[in-house]
Amino acid sequence: MSVSVDVFWSFRSPYSYFVTPDLIRLRQDFDVDLHLRPVLPIAVRAKETLFSADQRRVQYIIRDASRRAEFLGMKYGFPSPDPIVQDLKTFEVAESQPYIFRLTGLGVEAARRGRGVE
């Protein structure tokens, strides 16, 4: 019997992107059963937590993600197309989000069918 790990994964998080190759290796090398649990990005579920008048937290995440990508030797940039409708200058998140709910739902369905981490 293999070990099971729940992976809470966001389609917008740079950290979810960075960990994906390691998750695939973990599954292959150690017979770990990965259960993908797609979550909505913080920009949608708790935007006031991240996007306040004080932008230092957002600026830190952007710098940290760039440093992490360089350390891992991975290409990194904002997602294109971005699944979140957001002004990247002011970080204002639009009320209407036509993409992320469907995309996250597709991730949930892929996980339900056993194809979450491929």
Q: Where is each model-derived feature located?
A:
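Short active-site neighborhood of thiol/selenol oxidoreductases, capturing the structured segment around
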Residues: S2-S13
